[in-house]
């Protein structure tokens, strides 16, 4: 048991240095690396924060290579108008790439994404400034796809 734990800890430190190659490098440390790769392929993997700017074909390829089931996209929250524009832009991006992406409105969408070999996108903000001074804006933001607001950089 101690050997496996140490191997796992070594592999974690390798992940910090070589995040894209961690699973390929683990066979040096763990004789059960193939089992780990299979587990990763079957698991629901969600990246908790992606800043979704400047997406192109390479971005989609990197996302596909990552094996992520979904991610939380942190959109621009400068004000209500900018936030709504960001939400509309990402809703359109998801529609235009429906062969790769689905809009995540709840946990079931991550399971659907996994089954359909797509990536679920959970839209949200790292700030609440886009609410401005009207809690009514929360309803509009929710209807447009907002599913999380993180109270981090409030001003």
Task: For the regions a language model picked out, list residue spans one by one.
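N-terminal hydrophobic targeting/anchoring segments and the immediately downstream early-domain regions
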Residues: 2-154
């Amino acid at each position: 048991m101690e050997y496996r734990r140490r191997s796992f800890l070594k592999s974690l430190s390798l992940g910090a240095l070589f995040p894209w190659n961690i699973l390929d490098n683990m066979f040096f440390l763990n004789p059960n690396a193939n089992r780990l790769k299979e587990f990763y392929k079957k698991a629901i993997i969600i990246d908790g924060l992606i800043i979704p700017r400047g997406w192109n074909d390479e971005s989609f390829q990197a996302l596909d290579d990552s094996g992520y089931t979904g991610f939380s996209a942190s959109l621009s929250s400068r004000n209500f108008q900018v936030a709504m524009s960001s939400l509309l832009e990402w809703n359109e991006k998801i529609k235009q790439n429906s062969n790769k992406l689905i809009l995540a409105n709840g946990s079931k969408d991550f399971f659907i994404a996994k089954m359909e070999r797509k990536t679920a996108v959970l839209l949200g903000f790292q700030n609440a400034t886009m609410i401005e001074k009207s809690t009514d804006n929360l309803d509009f933001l929710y209807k447009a796809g907002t599913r999380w607001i993180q109270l981090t950089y409030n001003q």
